[in-house]
């Protein structure tokens, strides 16, 4: 191979590499995850494990903060000890009613209910976290996790997070035996919940610079 061919081959490889980098940068990025919370879950007396959820605090800050604070229980009430009271295969699992446990209760950190923040995000895939409601502007504490894409809920329910780890546990819950009103025969309970340190918050602790 002569020098000219080597030279052309080098620039061909370089051009392909740059094109791939550019294509990767051009890929649409998902919503920014600003907080991570966890649920440790039991079915009956059997531990299922931990589900880690990422919250979209840039896109829907009010909704994300409500869920985060209910996960930590820092307001004196929250998700710990509550159940997944409604489970529908090939649709979703629903929880968050920590006052009545049957889908008629719950409350937000802002009062009993708060308004729909926005509908920027859609129910495009499994593992998305969205607010359950009883109609327009009736968000409280109840939520659901999708197990399939649910586009018919777009514009009606606020998507505010996603499952980061432990989706296999969501799938197990989806398949538990159910009785009347899609309620699990054996209780599916959040035995512990809280917040995990996110990369953003860890970085803030190590830096004195203000974010622009």
From Swiss-Prot:
Protein activity control:
Inhibited by cyclosporin A (CsA).
A GO BP entry is: protein folding
Per the record, where are the segments of Basic and acidic residues compositional bias? 192-212
Ranges spanned by the short sequence motif Prevents secretion from ER, renumbered to the chain: 209-212
Q: Which residues are glycosylated?
A: 139
Q: Any idea where this protein resides? A: Endoplasmic reticulum lumen
User: What Gene Ontology terms describe where this protein resides (cellular component)?
Assistant: endoplasmic reticulum lumen; fungal-type vacuole
Per the record, the major location class is endoplasmic reticulum
Q: What one GO molecular function would you report for this record?
A: peptidyl-prolyl cis-trans isomerase activity
Listed under catalytic activity are: [protein]-peptidylproline (omega=180) = [protein]-peptidylproline (omega=0)
Start and end residues of each PPIase cyclophilin-type domain: 38-195
Q: Which UniProt keywords apply?
A: Endoplasmic reticulum, Glycoprotein, Isomerase, Rotamase, Signal
Give the family this protein belongs to, as stated in its UniProt record.
Answer: Belongs to the cyclophilin-type PPIase family. PPIase B subfamily.
- Functional note: PPIases accelerate the folding of proteins. It catalyzes the cis-trans isomerization of proline imidic peptide bonds in oligopeptides.
Q: What is this protein called?
A: Peptidyl-prolyl cis-trans isomerase B
Taxonomic source organism: Aspergillus niger
């Amino acid at each position: 191979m002569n020098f000219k061919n080597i030279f052309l081959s080098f620039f061909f490889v370089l051009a392909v590499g740059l094109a791939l980098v550019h294509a990767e940068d051009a890929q649409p990025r998902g919503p920014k995850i600003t907080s991570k919370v966890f649920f440790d879950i039991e079915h009956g007396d059997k531990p299922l494990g931990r589900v880690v959820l990422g919250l979209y605090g840039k896109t829907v800050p009010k909704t994300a903060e409500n869920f985060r604070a209910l996960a930590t229980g820092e307001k004196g009430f929250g998700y710990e000890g509550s159940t997944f009271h409604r489970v529908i295969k090939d649709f979703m699992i629903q929880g968050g009613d920590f006052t009545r446990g049957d889908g008629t209760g719950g409350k937000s950190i802002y009062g009993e209910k708060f308004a729909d923040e926005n509908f920027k995000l859609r129910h495009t895939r499994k593992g998305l976290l969205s607010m359950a409601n009883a109609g327009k502007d009736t968000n409280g504490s109840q939520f659901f996790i999708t197990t399939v894409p649910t586009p018919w809920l777009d514009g009606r329910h606020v998507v505010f997070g996603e499952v980061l780890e432990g989706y296999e546990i969501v799938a197990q819950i989806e398949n538990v035996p159910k009785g009347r009103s899609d309620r699990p025969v054996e209780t599916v309970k959040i035995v512990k919940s809280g917040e995990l340190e996110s990369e953003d918050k860890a970085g803030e602790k190590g830096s004195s610079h203000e974010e622009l």
